[in-house]
């Protein structure tokens, strides 16, 4: 623990906590101050000036990052018949029906994305208490409740991310790995920022993005100037 604290202090010394960096500077600093011994994940965090208690100010969606996330996603699909075969052909890791519900209720959670055809939502609904808190419940808004299961699987495997504002208006998203070229992280960051800007509620007032930062798995947070995006 002492070693980690020393590494964190060294990382913090390289950052001006009073400054909001340009996206390019922030990405470079995130890579420079990362001290994890593994290929750490790079994540961005937004605080938005929205009131999520209002139905028209709830932000939720999905997008495919231009350079992927660097993470291998394990995709589970609830489907039957031809759609089940379609999901398997597209590369789904797990495909099934009731037997998967029982397995998940038994504590199995070795997957990252859940996709379902609309007709399967009646049985998937039984998993609400398990999948809901983990943000894994299939939803039409994120493209995970669909008849086009092949597309959903391929997008999930190809760098699709989902995002949702919490009760305080915070949104987090993975934009890649520390090992990515800086230009690719910047491109992913800008693409995600575009999605956040497009999702701005028409009824939102004042400054939309009140705080923005970038961090790695074990690294310090670095403030980012939203205007640089």
From Swiss-Prot:
GO CC annotations? large ribosomal subunit
- Give the matching Gene3D superfamilies: 3.30.190.20, 3.40.50.790
SUPFAM superfamilies attached to this UniProt entry: Ribosomal protein L1
Share an example GO biological-process annotation for this protein. Answer: translation
Q: Does the keyword Repressor apply?
A: yes
Superkingdom to which the source organism belongs: Bacteria
> Which GO molecular-function terms appear in the entry?
rRNA binding; structural constituent of ribosome; tRNA binding
Presence of keyword Transmembrane helix: no
UniProt keyword list? Repressor, Ribonucleoprotein, Ribosomal protein, RNA-binding, rRNA-binding, Translation regulation, tRNA-binding
Q: List the disulfide bonds.
A: none
Stated role: Binds directly to 23S rRNA. The L1 stalk is quite mobile in the ribosome, and is involved in E site tRNA release.
Q: Which family does it belong to?
A: Belongs to the universal ribosomal protein uL1 family.
Q: Describe, as the record does, how this protein assembles with itself and its partners.
A: Part of the 50S ribosomal subunit.
Q: What is this protein called?
A: Large ribosomal subunit protein uL1
State the species of origin: Streptococcus thermophilus (strain ATCC BAA-250 / LMG 18311)
Gene name of this polypeptide? rplA
């Amino acid at each position: 623990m002492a070693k980690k604290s020393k590494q964190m202090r060294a990382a913090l010394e390289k950052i001006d906590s009073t400054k909001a960096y340009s996206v390019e500077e922030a990405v470079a600093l995130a890579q420079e101050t990362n001290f994890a011994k593994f290929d750490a994940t790079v994540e961005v965090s937004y605080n938005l000036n929205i009131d999520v208690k209002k139905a028209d100010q709830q932000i939720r969606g999905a997008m495919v990052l231009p350079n992927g996330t660097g993470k291998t996603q394990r995709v589970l699909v609830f489907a039957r018949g031809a759609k089940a075969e379609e999901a398997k052909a597209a590369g789904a890791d797990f495909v099934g029906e009731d037997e998967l519900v029982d397995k998940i209720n038994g504590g199995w959670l070795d997957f990252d994305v859940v996709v379902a055809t609309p007709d399967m939502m009646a049985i998937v609904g039984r998993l609400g208490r398990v999948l809901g808190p983990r943000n894994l419940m299939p939803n039409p808004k994120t493209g995970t409740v669909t008849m086009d299961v092949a597309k959903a699987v391929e997008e999930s495997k190809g760098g699709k991310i989902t995002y949702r504002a919490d009760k305080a208006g915070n949104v987090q998203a993975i934009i890649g790995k520390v090992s990515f070229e800086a230009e690719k992280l910047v491109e992913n960051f800008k693409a995600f920022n575009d999605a956040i800007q497009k999702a701005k509620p028409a009824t939102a007032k004042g400054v939309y993005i009140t705080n923005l930062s970038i961090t790695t798995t074990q690294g310090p947070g670095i403030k980012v100037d939203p205007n640089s995006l």
